[in-house]
Amino acid sequence: MGAPPGYRPSAWVHLLHQLPRADFQLRPVPSVFAPQEQEYQQALLLVAALAGLGLGLSLIFIAVYLIRFCCCRPPEPPGSKIPSPGGGCVTWSCIVALLAGCTGIGIGFYGNSETSDGVSQLSSALLHANHTLSTIDHLVLETVERLGEAVRTELTTLEEVLEPRTELVAAARGARRQAEAAAQQLQGLAFWQGVPLSPLQVAENVSFVEEYRWLAYVLLLLLELLVCLFTLLGLAKQSKWLVIVMTVMSLLVLVLSWGSMGLEAATAVGLSDFCSNPDPYVLNLTQEETGLSSDILSYYLLCNRAVSNPFQQRLTLSQRALANIHSQLLGLEREAVPQFPSAQKPLLSLEETLNVTEGNFHQLVALLHCRSLHKDYGAALRGLCEDALEGLLFLLLFSLLSAGALATALCSLPRAWALFPPSDDYDDTDDDDPFNPQESKRFVQWQSSI
């Protein structure tokens, strides 16, 4: 299969494509993109399930660590205000983990933007291909209608005017037959007319899904950013209630991070299988959805010398018919106009129609060449297999950093808030001190009672 211009499978595609795949029975599955097959679906689900396994192991590790911390902690002597050894190390490890999580959030924003750019490039390529196909249909329809109108009006009028001269009538009828033949050949060039699959509809569906995917990731990134910032604030202010609330939120974001990691990993693996050799799948799917012949689809997907233009014969016959019409009209203009001046008007109208038809024909020749649609195909692959896949890998790195940072924070936060001084420590001030909170409270109560 020939590669589209400017597209070559990247190193990431080759690396992910080489990873082994297995179904639920752990039997090997070929790395061929086949989403309709059950074994391949199971292989991708198994990749996503690895993230679920990681989540389970993380939760077990956190639970065991916290149980050990709660049950095996040596009792502190009553009234002791000496911080336990290693307390500062625990707090700083939590801070470093949260800062690493913030770094992962930055990577996540970049990956989300890259993925969105790749999908936007895919949508733009589909829209340009839809414009090309619509232009072909419009030009064919306009040209056929012009030729049909010329046959019904100008050529009929010309035959009536030239009726006294049999040989001139025969020439006009020859031009009629050539116009009808050209219209018939041109009508077969609108190969996408009536096809149920619309690139415009596909582009709209892709953009619709991408908008919600982008928004979901932005909300996830902002949620984790808020959790990290408020946790750091709680540690700085030594606010126990804020740290406890953020611990619960960290657990929620940890679950979301592992879930997004599984989705990203399965998508990246499946996308690498598609991008390693996209032509067979695109060819089969498009043929199934459109019903077009494999010759037409192969011509536009491959666009090389090994595949001939399936419209070449129709184009040649149409060009020959238009040339014959042109020569016959020139002959009629030389011989008929001096004898039948009233024939000049329909002849001029026919020449104008022929000039417009030839202009449309040359546009059709350029549009029907494989270069334009094949270029759109290559742009779509570059957007999907380069930018979008790279963005997915950055999102995968974000999820990994996020899961590690939050797991570390969940282990450190309970130990950190256990080191916070109790609220009673703030009451160990002189009772006669006017700035003592308790004394101020009693003073306000005394004033209200007066």
UniProtKB/Swiss-Prot annotation:
Cellular localisation: Cell membrane
Tissue distribution of the protein: Expressed in brain, eye, ovary and testis, and at lower levels in muscle, placenta, liver and lung.
Domain of life: Eukaryota
Gene Ontology molecular function: calcium ion binding; chloride channel activity; intracellularly calcium-gated chloride channel activity; iron ion transmembrane transporter activity; volume-sensitive chloride channel activity
Catalytic reaction equation(s): chloride(in) = chloride(out); L-glutamate(out) = L-glutamate(in)
Residue ranges, annotated region (Disordered): 428-450
Disulphide linkage map: 275-385, 303-370
GO annotation terms (biological process): cell morphogenesis; cell-cell adhesion; cell-substrate adhesion; chloride transport; filopodium assembly; gene expression; iron ion transport; L-glutamate transmembrane transport
Site location (Essential for the formation of the channel-pore): 165
Record PTM Phosphoserine, positions in chain: 440
Gene Ontology CC annotations of this record: chloride channel complex; filopodium membrane; filopodium tip; membrane; plasma membrane; smooth endoplasmic reticulum membrane; synapse
Residues that carry a glycan: 130, 205, 284, 355
Keyword Ligase: no
CDD domains: Tweety_N (cd07912)
Pfam families referenced in this protein's UniProt entry, alphabetically: Tweety (PF04906)
Family under the similarity heading: Belongs to the tweety family.
Task of the protein: Calcium-independent, swelling-dependent volume-regulated anion channel (VRAC-swell) which plays a pivotal role in the process of regulatory volume decrease (RVD) in the brain through the efflux of anions like chloride and organic osmolytes like glutamate.
Protein name per its UniProtKB record: Protein tweety homolog 1
Organism lineage: Eukaryota, Metazoa, Chordata, Craniata, Vertebrata
Gene name as annotated: TTYH1
